[in-house]
Amino acid sequence: MKNKQLLCVLFPLLVACTGQRHQQQVSSESIIEEAVRKGEVLKGEIVPIDTALFRYAYRMRVQGDKAVILDLHNADYYYHVFTYPDFQYQSSFGKRGEGPGESIYAANIRFAGQDTVWVLDDGKGRMYQYSGIAGGKTPKQEKDILLDKRLFRSLDFDLKDASTVVIPDYSGENRFSWASLSSGELLRKSEQIPVSDPELLRESAPAVAQGWNSFVSFSPDKKILVSVTQFGDRLDIYSMASQKHIGELGGDGEPQFKVSPEGYGLPAGRICYYDVQVTDQYIYTIYDGRKFKDIMKLADAYQQGGKILRISTHEGDVVKTYVLDRPIAGIYVDELSLIHISEPTR
């Protein structure tokens, strides 16, 4: 297995985006074609990692001087700890398996303190808290929480505070579910899926929720929650204080899907957003936009990930769009210095 590499993009290339506000209403194909024609493709600086750990580096989280990378397809452990920003390997945790304390399918990871993280296992419907996420320490599982059965298919999450987690609602009854981090109990549900066909939502709510599968991110101050759709060009911003909702529909349109005879929502349009991170000033997203029919034609040549980096204000205005020199799946944005991007492998 070849050594994994991380793609780093110097942030000074991005800060010039302020003042160029516009709505993103053109297709992803047009964006990439225009960038290539003008020679405006953003090239990254490679940071090699002296290890062959990764098969599919999917998410990166950073806290102080340490970084944790989630590898979806690792045979032994899902999570790997590195020093930051030099990326020296420290330890691995989150053993893959079906035994007690092991994970069947890791969905995401969030820091809950300087050396503490929460992780989500969709396969078991459980959340685990680990301590010792630092150089020279051994990660230790501190908590094992069984999520409420009404939170079925928990595919992403973020932490509202030390006691509450938000998870996209896969039942279709609402947009979000809120659960206790001490008991796993469902506390409440909020918002509605903003599908353009309300009748479809009433008739096939679970299928709509699957078609509108979303990734979520809180702002650092927890004042806004942002969601982006995996199979459509839709970004939504929710104010926690005022309950104000801003919805932005891009040029590739809302999620397209078919309802199967069994009631499942089968994606039928495009693969769109891969990741979202909200910072103090902006919303950063990685976007693909390729049609499934075109992906099928690529067969083994298909590379997962998006090449479009969008930067938006907290009000949803797109201030800058960059095209990257390779497809990537996950980002970590440090607005003071670097953007670190985990690059997936086939």
Task: Give the label of every model feature segment.
Residues 253-262, 317-334:
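Conserved blade-ending motifs and adjacent loop-strand segments that build the rim/top face
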Residues 46-77, 284-288:
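Beta-strand-rich domains and repeat architectures in extracellular enzymes and scaffolds
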Residues 180, 299-316:
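Beta-propeller blade signature
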Residues 88-116, 122, 145-146, 325-328:
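Blade-loop segments of beta-propeller domains
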Residues 28-54:
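A short helix->beta-strand "capping" segment at the edge of beta-propeller domains
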Residues 58-61, 108-112, 155-160, 208-221, ...:
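Structural signature of eukaryotic scaffold interfaces centered on beta-propeller domains
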Residues 285-303:
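Short, conserved, GDST-rich strand-edge loop motifs in beta-rich repeat architectures
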Residues 336-345:
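Residue-level detector of conserved catalytic or cofactor/ligand-binding positions
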